[in-house]
């Protein structure tokens, strides 16, 4: 009798520890997958930028992104709007852009992984410009969507699938139109049309993604608030199943919203109406910098959540060195790289102040971050104690 009682106690303890062990193994097996995405705005090549890059032998853009490389390496994917073509020489800036191939290589070297190519400058150099741009990107293994050299290319890259581990997202890209008329050819470009977008969202869903991203080229240039059309298109897309909307074209930053859309299914959505200029020669107030969107996803038990939705600010420094200008994208946390109290530093301060005043007033659920390269982490800007936030 005593032996049976002892055996029963031992078995209960064994079962207790076995259950604990199995729970541990189960929770370990369900380690959350994460995905970190960065989005950047208008990547431009005005004439002075092209002239600046020439070193007598080639076009050197190595200065452009030096301060952002640690942040971009931190992300799993960096996605930007390519607002130039690679049509070969002669190289031209505004109004019909064609940049050196070296600039494409500089984007690749800066850890920019994906470029959306549907914008009003896509056809600046006609059909040949579209085709050659895609060939240059393909040669550098830079993924792309928005314009397509033929139907086969369209089928391959529309939607563009972004995947890390078990997390899978579908990316679509559209523009309101092009500056140069689109001639009939095998080349394709995605134009904003709600009927087409609805169909494309259904197509994207057939790939069983965890979420759908749409990168739009829309809105009014130099307007700091979204217009009615942007808001209506955003609401339409979200109602039809898109989750994360990114905007470009206005060349200035516009507000950002994170929403819980529908209490019945608790869908999360984010809209960044415009990220402004990532790099350009535009020097007017609010056009000399931009926002960097940051989305961090966690997937647990087959459900994707936005762990963090934020933004970071950066400014294009047109620095005079050795009798010429060079262009450097300076993020807010590298403010002190610019000479103290100089006209350049004051210009960056003006940009940061103006951007924060706008976004602090109109943003919903999306706050500013900075990147600490020593800790390789993002932190809320309010925790940063540098000379100028």
Language model features with spans:
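Acidic, metal/ion-coordinating pockets
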Residues: 30-389
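Positively charged n-region of N-terminal signal peptides that target proteins for export
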Residues: 2-14
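Sec/Tat signal peptide C-region and signal peptidase I cleavage site
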Residues: 25-29
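Sec-dependent N-terminal signal peptides
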Residues: 14-23
